[in-house]
Amino acid sequence: MQFKNILVVCIGNICRSPMAEYLLKQNYPQLTIHSAGISGMIGYSADEKAQLCMERIGIDMSPHIAKKLNAELLKQADLILVMSQNQQKHIEQTWPFAKGKTFRLGHWQGKNIPDPYQHDQAFFDETSLLIQTCVADWTKHI
């Protein structure tokens, strides 16, 4: 299936989902890619530690502004990528129409992506590497 509109979701939309969003945008500039948070920290920039992770690989996340997940974003998406099984379950229960197009970013590895929020830079670095690997795993499916 060819996806045209991808939505990446985490909790606050300041750490994991923006990193995945910007990696996907770099790999697929022809697609529409957004991110949002279940409990979005609306109006916040990406976490400085997440921005540093992306800067190290040549990606500027400074334009990112966090937003809260809503039904309209979910309806527009052909593919919804979440960070954990709990997030997938929450979305599918709250918005049943999202079932069948909501998957974990770590689906192909059977992994959840741990939340680095309020952890040290080393934890962010590990999370960033896992996100990069998981984004690469989606390549043959997007």
UniProtKB/Swiss-Prot annotation:
Drop me one GO molecular function for this one.
protein tyrosine phosphatase activity
Q: Which UniProt keywords apply?
A: Exopolysaccharide synthesis, Hydrolase, Protein phosphatase
Q: What is this protein called?
A: Low molecular weight protein-tyrosine-phosphatase Ptp
* Keyword Disulfide bond set for record: no
The pathway noted for it is:
Glycan metabolism; exopolysaccharide biosynthesis
Instruction: Give its E.C. classification number.
Output: 3.1.3.48
Q: Which reaction does it catalyse?
A: O-phospho-L-tyrosyl-[protein] + H2O = L-tyrosyl-[protein] + phosphate
Can you tell me which family this protein belongs to? Answer: Belongs to the low molecular weight phosphotyrosine protein phosphatase family.
What InterPro entries does the record point to?
LMW_PTPase, Ptyr_pPase, Ptyr_pPase_sf, Tyr_phospatase_low_mol_wt
Q: How is its activity regulated?
A: Inhibited by ammonium molybdate, sodium orthovanadate, N-ethylmaleimide and iodoacetic acid.
Gene3D superfamilies registered for this protein in UniProt: 3.40.50.2300
Locate the active site. Answer: 10, 16, 115
What does the record list as GO biological process? Answer: polysaccharide biosynthetic process
Job description of the protein = Dephosphorylates ptk. May be involved in the production and the transport of exopolysaccharides.
Q: What class of enzyme is it?
A: hydrolase
